[in-house]
Amino acid sequence: MASTADFLLDDQTDEDFFDKLVDDSYTPTASSSAKELKFDDGSDSDDAKAFANLSVVDDVLGDGDVALNEAGLGNDVANEGTSGSVGKEEPSSSIAPEAVQFVNSDANRLRDVDVVRSEVDDMALTETGKESNIVDGSGSPGVKEVDWGSFYADSSVNDGGGFGSYSDFFTELDATAGNVQGQAEVAVATGGNLVANDTINTSVGLDNSAGFEQHQGQVQHDSGSGQYVDNSQSWENLYPGWKYDASTGQWYQVDGQDATVNSQESYINSTGNWESVAADNSDVAYLKQSTTSAMAGTAESVSTWNQVSQVGNGYPEHMVFDAQYPGWYYDTIAQEWRSLDSYNQASQTTVTGQAHDQQVQNGHARTTTYHNNSQSSVYDVNNKNQTFKAQDFAIQGQHGSWDESYYANNQQAGNTWQPVNVGKAEPAVTSDSLSRFGGNQQVNNLYSTESVAEQFKPNTIGAQSFIPQHMNVASATQNGPLSFSNDLYNRQQSVDHAQKSFQNNQLFSPSVGRSSDRRPPHALVSFGFGGKLIVMKDNNGSLQNTSFGSQGIGGSSITVLNLAEVISGSASYSSPGEDSLSYFRCLHQQSLPGPLVGGNVGSKELHKWIDERLLHCESSNMDFSRGKLLKMLLSLLRISCQYYGKLRSPFGSDASQKETDTPEAAVAKLFAFAKKDGIQNGYAPISQCLQHLPPESQMQVTASEVQNLLASGRKMEALQCAQEGHLWGPALVIAAQLGDQFYVDTVKQMALRQLIPGSPLRTLCLLVAGQPAEVCPTGSSSSMLDNWEENLGIITANRTTDDDLVIIHLGDSMWKERGEIIAAHICYLIADKNFDPYSESARLCLVGADHWKCPRTYASPDAIQRTELYEYSKTLGNSQYILLPFQPYKIIYAHMLAEVGKLSTAQKYCQAVIRCLKTSRSSEVEMWKQFASSLEERIRSHQEGGNLAPAKLVGKLLNSLWGMPPPAPHSTTGNPQVNEYQHQQQEAAKLSYSQSANTMSSLMPPASIEPVHEWGGNGRTMAAHSRSVSEPDFSRTPIQDQTDSSKDKAPDGVTQVKSTRKVPSSRFSRFGIGILKNTVGKVFPSRSSNEAKLGNENQFYYDDNLKRWVERGVEPPAEEAALPPPPTSVPFRSNSLGHENKSEIKNEMSPSSGSWSSGSPTPSENSPGIPPVSQGSNQFSARGRMGVRARYVDTYNQGSSSMYQSPPVQSSKPPIPAKAKFFVPAAPASFANDQVMESVSAETRQENSGDEAVVGSAGAPGPSQASFQSPTPSPIAMQRFPSVDNIRRSGSGTSLNGDLPQSVSRRTASWSGSVNSSSFMSPTSASTFRPSPLNSSSSSLGEELQEVEL
């Protein structure tokens, strides 16, 4: 040869063959002058270049000689021209001489084929075994002629297939060549990259067979016109989106290039040659197709000829046989060798459906198009030449890009071939079934995608990934599995086992039943309360052949699954991600034995849980650094539990205590152990502490100088000399003698000049010197952060002043600069940093949770558990400790527990939260209570069976008998407790003695603490308010008094209630005087004997000397000291119940407890129920709630929420005499007009002109400087209405309008039969101020206790 190229081949068999070829194993003697071929290991692309550069030189033999022209390296296609002759002769057959032509083509044009043919028509064929020397200029042979049988000589080298496994093909070609008339021109069209995978076999010399490979070439008959594929186009097909410029040799990217279009065009050119085939003149072309993309991850690179020769053996393509292992086959799907006997036994009992509509004969498929009556002739490997007619067929649901045609290679049909007597346990799916994914896939080249869909394996669900069987397969993307098993309950069987009753190979077509946006149907999944997972499956759609339903069953099915079982690693479900597993693991498997606060948790159980979590931190699936920090954090929380919530002793505690008994010693040991463990593992180097020290000789000189200075008594100079010479020991001694300031300064100088920045010793020295700002200077804290464990340990073990600020700063630096949230929280816990509600400035919300980086997901179960452990450790030292910002996270944790099905634990958490928030009084706390109560009620209802709960059934029964209950009290804000609390504050501000009222309000339990459960309409309990002054008397018929103060008549006569709320009337009133009422009357006997009996004559009279009311026959008590004057800062409030100002009455007098209405409540609303507790009562009236009936008027209750009511100043409507049994409290209202205020002001001035005294009721002390004033007389009978009469004391300030002084009202009681218009008279002068005698002859009210205001 003129020149030799370096062939880079990977196949060991090819290399051995050519080594023998060079060693004259197959050559004559003249071959010794030929240059040896060198073979190096290289890539496939280098192999292709070497083969492309091979050409014949045409300057040796003239017109009839063979010329090898060496193509340029820049050409993308080798220029091949031949004028030599090769031949093959066997005794068994007479073969006419045939000219072998090598078509010469380059990247720019295709040469005329006829011209090349004319040059080689006269070539003669040599005999077998002879050589046709194609020599160069020196006459040395360049090309060797080898018998075709030599390629198959060494069968043991190539697994029984010989070199390249081409011998069988050409032997059969030679056997059938005698029947071919005319000349057969062998055209080699080398398009694009000849070598595309590791299994390609390339021959050199006259055997320019272009590397025939089953997935890269096809045997086709070329028409007489001679159609050839442009090689540059093949290169462009190989790299979609790029275009090759032959003139410049550069690649250019093409926008919008579609690989599918290139594949389609190339396919049309290659398949169009099959339509018109001439029987007498046929060209055998080895068309090398270009591969667009190779699918990665092949099972194994095997010899391709072995598989081609097994096409007609009746076995699937994923079964690879090897002659060296008879009776065994390699399963490319299972990736293992299996016995052929086991497959035959399984295939005899398995009947599978045929997935094709096209008959495959002898293992070969034919390419079928829509052209009728077209014939294709394919050379069979079994030495047969078959001619068969293409069959017409319809394409259903085809929307692909293959020009409405199927394609296959020489081995595999356009669809799955399946002999009737052979069954497959795992069906193969090829290009036919892929093409039925209309619109859902993209086939990037012309080869059949021999991908196999695995059946369901044990412990898996859903379609497994498609495993390609060979290297050179198309890159196809499909949206769903191709073949499924209908087995839902037979997952425990082996994949190799024949599933007779459940096997179904019917293909799944997602194009059927799709939605408008081309989405396939799927099952609906929803979460249910209590850890349930609900799955609804539609059996009517295209899912009926999948594993989600059984074939032939219509309708839908709903399945309720237990979420805990699904997540716990059931064999029927695929495992979710690690994050999901950690979430459910914390809730279900590693949940706290809580609630810790308010629960009954033993110390052993708690320590066991901590040990399990510490062991989990050391597991392999957790990051090492994070696991190390979590382990340290949990150990710190355990120390906190051991020392009752303390991680450090208070500053200045007893130093004589043993170091081992303190919590800071335990914390220091923890950090020391972590540092030691890090040094042993090699990730924490030993830190250096000291800087460079002066030499020893210099130290000796400095010491002598300091000694001389001290001997002369110059301490300051000696101290300065010792500091400059780094003689810190004597310097500290001298500084201690000079004073604390010198000592602190010397320690600071030593830390800054001798110790390395960031070292723990330097940190401690600066803290001792009282310089915390120097510990972490700005911009140089990285060295301290590197040793943050040691620094934190030394600060913790040695308490100094303001060291907590340094620890907090260290945590902030770790969080902001290093992003170590766990390390930062360790610092915050040691510094005893308070927990804060969620905000941008909060440092500590949950232990170990980054609420800055993950504001929506930081409330994880493990973070809540760690925070609860810290709260529990605090309660061990202080049982009254409440971590208030943590309570809402407990409610969130209870919801998490309810989601996974742990309802009982979630209910306990709700109850614990309600108990913790029992004493809190704020708006957010009330909201948390509502959330916890709502979840608890929902859990209780769920546990009782939902709507079939016994409580609800009984409630419905009572409602059907008695009717619906009255509507619930209406609240303007929807929160009775909040309204009650706010009302207490408002009423306390209105009182002159607000201190006593506030004291009593703090002692009063709210309405929610003492609930009275009643049957509600829905079976739930309604909370009634606390017991009032006295208990209701069910044995007596209540007096229904009618008043018009709270009701107005509409024009149509309908009564309109003006009150904002009503008192729920007793349900027993619905029965009248029924049997049930009489029974209750016997249970609760009448208390009429306890009522006061008024006599015919009043026992009290007004004493002019004492200026007060006294009782006849009773010696008056001694004069008491005058009370101190009232506070002057309390504003004056003058109120009256004017009906023209009803809006103010509603705003100021509406109590928030929901038990009585604004304005004057009607007796019909108050008499049957329980009167409410006065919100502004003090400790002297507390006995009314204890069941003791008050005999005298409560003069210590001030303000609108008094137990008793006083008559109004004036009334706009004539009231009706009231006959109620109890005194109903009411709130004060402002005066209606200025005339009444002026009248009261005038009376107050008259009262203050004389001596002022107070006559109180017997047994109750009365103030001596208080004055009385008479109410404005009313022309009608008195009615109980609220009134606050303000009487100025001495020393009081000015009032609202400037001329009415501030005063204090006092009320007393009088025993009388009735009160008429002449009961009280306005005073005429200050000296004659006294009430007129009460009229005892009137009997309008009978023997009722009336409230009289003096």
From Swiss-Prot:
Gene Ontology cellular component terms for the protein in this record: endoplasmic reticulum exit site; Golgi stack
InterPro entries referenced in this protein's UniProt entry, alphabetically: Sec16_CCD (IPR024340), Sec16_Sec23-bd (IPR024298)
Biased composition (Low complexity): 1150-1168, 1317-1343
Ranges of Polar residues composition bias in the record: 970-1002, 1195-1210, 1289-1316
Gene3D superfamilies the UniProt entry points to: 1.25.40.1030
Compartments, as annotated in UniProt: Golgi apparatus, Golgi stack; Endoplasmic reticulum
Residue segments, region Disordered: 26-45, 73-97, 964-1063, 1118-1216, 1235-1350
Major localization class: Golgi
Gene Ontology process terms (BP): intracellular transport; protein transport; vesicle-mediated transport
Phosphoserine sites (modified residues): S43
Keyword Heme on entry: no
Basic and acidic residues: bias regions: 35-45
Gene knockout outcome: No visible phenotype under normal growth conditions, but dry seeds of mutant plants accumulate the precursors of the two major storage proteins albumin 2S and globulin 12S.
Keywords linked to the UniProt accession: Endoplasmic reticulum, ER-Golgi transport, Golgi apparatus, Phosphoprotein, Protein transport, Transport
Family: Belongs to the SEC16 family.
Subunit architecture: Interacts with SEC13A, SEC13B and SEC31A.
Summary of the function given for this chain in its UniProt record: Required for efficient protein export from the endoplasmic reticulum (ER) to the Golgi by regulating COPII coat dynamics at the ER. Functions as a scaffold and regulator of COPII coat assembly at ER exit sites.
Protein's recorded name: Protein transport protein SEC16A homolog
Source species of the chain: Arabidopsis thaliana (Mouse-ear cress)
Name of the gene: MAG5
